[in-house]
């Protein structure tokens, strides 16, 4: 599969924490597009387990092997971030029909706020379809083993958070 002319895409999310499901989508997007920017949302309305800086750092660490992937934190509207980095496409993951309904509404809002911004939806590989950051946090908080759901650096950080 060949790439089109220069394409810069944004994969936005809270990534609290980044999971193997996220990484699966990032690796696949990196093969399809020239540049992938992981946009880690500050999300002040959410009570995140990890700070914005930690979440950006995790994203950078787990994607070091991908030359065309970077990670940045942002606050405010995602469309403003996309405009600031001159991105023309958003990557969004869909696990369920509930995700689809939510993303469909967001996509229409994004189009109104930033005409020309397209959304590309990727479904996760079967082994990652059930993974969510929320579930991973819950399992970790209750002492469960999350090593099969998140990259090693994240599993270690979750283990440390549980000790605190």
Curated annotation (Swiss-Prot):
Gene Ontology biological process terms in this record: coenzyme A biosynthetic process
Pfam families in the cross-refs: CTP_transf_like
Annotated site location: Transition state stabilizer: 22
SUPFAM superfamilies: Nucleotidylyl transferase (SSF52374)
Keywords, sorted A to Z: ATP-binding, Coenzyme A biosynthesis, Cytoplasm, Magnesium, Nucleotide-binding, Nucleotidyltransferase, Transferase
Coiled coil: none
Class of enzymatic activity (EC top level): transferase
Predominant subcellular localization, coarse grouping: cytoplasm
InterPro entries named among the record's database cross-references: Cyt_trans-like (IPR004821), PPAT (IPR001980), Rossmann-like_a/b/a_fold (IPR014729)
Gene Ontology MF terms: ATP binding; pantetheine-phosphate adenylyltransferase activity
Cofactor: Mg(2+)
Pathways involved: Cofactor biosynthesis; coenzyme A biosynthesis; CoA from (R)-pantothenate: step 4/5
Domain of life of the organism encoding this protein: Bacteria
Residues the record lists as binding substrate: 14, 46, 78, 92
Binding site for ATP: 14-15, 22, 93-95, 103, 128-134
Entry EC number(s): 2.7.7.3
Protein location: Cytoplasm
Catalytic function, reaction form: (R)-4'-phosphopantetheine + ATP + H(+) = 3'-dephospho-CoA + diphosphate
GO cellular component: cytoplasm
Membership in a protein family: Belongs to the bacterial CoaD family.
Function: Reversibly transfers an adenylyl group from ATP to 4'-phosphopantetheine, yielding dephospho-CoA (dPCoA) and pyrophosphate.
Subunit structure: Homohexamer.
Name of protein: Phosphopantetheine adenylyltransferase
């Amino acid at each position: 599969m060949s790439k089109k002319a220069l394409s810069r895409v944004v994969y936005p999310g809270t990534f609290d924490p980044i999971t193997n499901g996220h990484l699966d989508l990032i690796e696949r997007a990196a093969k399809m597009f020239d540049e992938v920017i992981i946009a880690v949302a500050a999300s002040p309305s959410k009570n995140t387990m990890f700070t914005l800086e930690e979440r950006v750092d995790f994203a950078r660490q787990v994607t070091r092997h991908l030359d065309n992937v970077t990670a940045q934190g942002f606050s405010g509207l995602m469309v403003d971030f996309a405009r600031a980095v001159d991105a023309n496409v958003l990557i969004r993951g869909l696990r369920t029909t509930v995700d689809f309904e939510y993303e469909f509404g967001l996509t229409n809002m994004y189009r109104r706020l930033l005409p020309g911004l397209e959304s590309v939806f990727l479904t996760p590989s079967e082994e990652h379809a059930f993974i969510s950051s929320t579930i991973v946090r819950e399992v970790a908080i209750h002492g469960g083993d999350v090593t099969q759901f998140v990259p090693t650096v994240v599993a270690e950080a979750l283990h440390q958070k549980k000790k605190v």
